Amino acid sequence: MAMAMALRRLSSSIDKPIRPLIRSTSCYMSSLPSEAVDEKERSRVTWPKQLNAPLEEVDPEIADIIEHEKARQWKGLELIPSENFTSVSVMQAVGSVMTNKYSEGYPGARYYGGNEYIDMAETLCQKRALEAFRLDPEKWGVNVQPLSGSPANFHVYTALLKPHERIMALDLPHGGHLSHGYQTDTKKISAVSIFFETMPYRLDESTGYIDYDQMEKSATLFRPKLIVAGASAYARLYDYARIRKVCNKQKAVMLADMAHISGLVAANVIPSPFDYADVVTTTTHKSLRGPRGAMIFFRKGVKEINKQGKEVLYDFEDKINQAVFPGLQGGPHNHTITGLAVALKQATTSEYKAYQEQVLSNSAKFAQTLMERGYELVSGGTDNHLVLVNLKPKGIDGSRVEKVLEAVHIASNKNTVPGDVSAMVPGGIRMGTPALTSRGFVEEDFAKVAEYFDKAVTIALKVKSEAQGTKLKDFVSAMESSSTIQSEIAKLRHEVEEFAKQFPTIGFEKETMKYKN
């Protein structure tokens, strides 16, 4: 009954105009001006005034840190492929009164009162999630409450596996993710590998592509209950049909973790895992460009007709929902769910599709320019939003290059490449195009970014040659103590900043910034 009432309220409210939450571009969600408050409504206590005061008045230290971060985002080049710039409208929703409400449970079945509008927001978010990925609500459901991607994956394992049942996933040094159960020969790094037995599949190091033949052989021996199709540093498309075949052979669940590529999938510019997977997880803040959260999609309805002619139904929905709450979470973050609903609406627009097409074009141009400048890319190129540069042929590693890039205001991240033995001093750099594409970068701009990257690597090689030891701290010391090196860094940093400042800011206006120089 409560669910029906919530749905009726939702359907009756969709066509009603919504009054704007704020009157300016500021993202501070303060109350109405004090002069608009009737004298009779004034409290006889003092704290409501502080609660309604703006951030710069209540906490100037934090306000100042935020202003510095704005300047960093404006003057720098954001190349971390798991980052993006979300919209003002999403930030307004995330910074709204929806953060105040507790709502353990699900729409229509809460353990707290007063959730009429929380139910409406979550139900609308679920509806938009299915629409964004073109899913039939009779065949797919979605949970929008997971707090982030790693917890979302653990929710799925907990829901569908017994303790110490077996998981196969792409090896972390070959582009996988910690949450897929990474462990070394001597240590269980991810908690997933503590509670479940895990075995990696890997790339064919001669090509940089996933070795599906070896995966199938390993699965035959290991007999996993669940196989993960997903990565954090793999620049090629997954062969979902091939993994589905392996899963069918082993009677294993196929989990697609599309955290990095969900925006591309939503825009229908790369193949969708939904055609093959049983369960799909994703974060919401990477290429999808929403707030920091996660979703779990699951098949429902008729799975097959058994030998007796009876329908066999998927049993994922109740198991996954119960694993999220009450299994591993309490109250959901309603402000995040509300912001996600906004992002999912944006993901169905023509502007969004054009953006994701540009993400791919920029990535291809970036890869081409890097290779023309003599850099080796793992797999020899890219089919998605990222490139993984193998720096070992250049005689340098990702940790050292990352330090120089950061000094010149280029944000990237060191990353393992096949053959690495240390995650702290890996041989690669991972870079992506979603964030800068959100700022309006096109192909020719990424050719320029590749030039800046090349200059930074050249500086890193000079620093390495001058360092008095082989440790990273020796490299940093040499970089900071050499006046010649510092001069080169300052020159490149100025070039980067002047270039970056030509492009629009996202989430705030340049004119409102405190630090504009």
UniProtKB/Swiss-Prot annotation:
Transmembrane segments: none
Keyword Membrane in annotation: no
EC numbers on record: 2.1.2.1
InterPro entries named in the record: PyrdxlP-dep_Trfase, PyrdxlP-dep_Trfase_major, PyrdxlP-dep_Trfase_small, Ser_HO-MeTrfase, Ser_HO-MeTrfase-like, Ser_HO-MeTrfase_PLP_BS, SHMT-like_dom
Subcellular compartments: Mitochondrion; Cytoplasm
Induction: Circadian-regulation. Induction by light.
Alphabetical keyword list: Cytoplasm, Mitochondrion, One-carbon metabolism, Pyridoxal phosphate, Transferase, Transit peptide, Ubl conjugation
Top enzyme category: transferase
GO biological process: circadian rhythm; glycine biosynthetic process from serine; glycine metabolic process; L-serine metabolic process; photorespiration; plant-type hypersensitive response; response to cold; response to light stimulus
Gene3D superfamilies in alphabetical order: Aspartate Aminotransferase, domain 1, Type I PLP-dependent aspartate aminotransferase-like (Major domain)
GO CC, alphabetical: apoplast; chloroplast stroma; chloroplast thylakoid; cytosol; cytosolic ribosome; mitochondrial matrix; mitochondrion; nucleus
Catalysed reaction, written as an equation: (6R)-5,10-methylene-5,6,7,8-tetrahydrofolate + glycine + H2O = (6S)-5,6,7,8-tetrahydrofolate + L-serine
Gene disruption phenotype: Displays a lethal photorespiratory phenotype when grown at ambient carbon dioxide.
Mod. after translation: Ubiquitinated.
Tissue expression per record: Ubiquitous. Mostly expressed in leaves, less abundant in stems, flowers and siliques, and barely detectable in roots.
Pathway(s) per entry: One-carbon metabolism; tetrahydrofolate interconversion
Domain of life (superkingdom): Eukaryota
Residue numbers of N6-(pyridoxal phosphate)lysine PTMs: K286
GO molecular function: glycine hydroxymethyltransferase activity; mRNA binding; poly(U) RNA binding; pyridoxal phosphate binding
PANTHER family per the UniProt record, alphabetical: SERINE HYDROXYMETHYLTRANSFERASE, SERINE HYDROXYMETHYLTRANSFERASE 1, MITOCHONDRIAL
The family this protein is said to belong to: Belongs to the SHMT family.
Note: Recessive mutant shmt1-1 (shm1-3) shows enhanced susceptibility to salt stress and to biotrophic and necrotrophic pathogens.
Protein's job: Functions in the photorespiratory pathway in catalyzing the interconversion of serine and glycine. Involved in controlling cell damage caused by abiotic stress, such as high light and salt and the hypersensitive defense response of plants.
Subunit note: Homotetramer. Interacts with GLU1. Interacts with UBP16.
Protein's recorded name: Serine hydroxymethyltransferase 1, mitochondrial
Organism of derivation: Arabidopsis thaliana (Mouse-ear cress)
Organismal lineage: Eukaryota, Viridiplantae, Streptophyta, Embryophyta, Tracheophyta
